[in-house]
């Protein structure tokens, strides 16, 4: 039986002040789930991304703000809430979309603004990074911890704060 035609669309618009700047992020590597970069749903931004929800819950349980998800090959794909950038030698590196990253709006803005290479990122690449930051529609957030490794907020993320309306 074919699906019934959808009803006429409804548009709902709400306006509210943006949430307060959450400050730098403390992250962990998710251990309970992986991002399936081969899934046809991989590039879909959805509130129903259970892997991301589970990773975020794991981060909270471990006292962190966010979790970085690895893909099925063990490389970094994204965080539970954002795209990931690792800076080395003044060049920002971010996983290609084929690694499981979402094509985020802020990701695109960062790529248009500064020197970025789409590079598959191993966990070891993050450990050797000069700085790590996350991007999503709410802004740019420096990462100050990944598991037991500390990082200082860096100049690349700071130089991009205006992209996020001063947040970052």
Q: Across the structure, where does each feature detected by a protein language model lie?
A:
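Helix-start/capping segments and mature chain N-termini
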Residues: 2-168
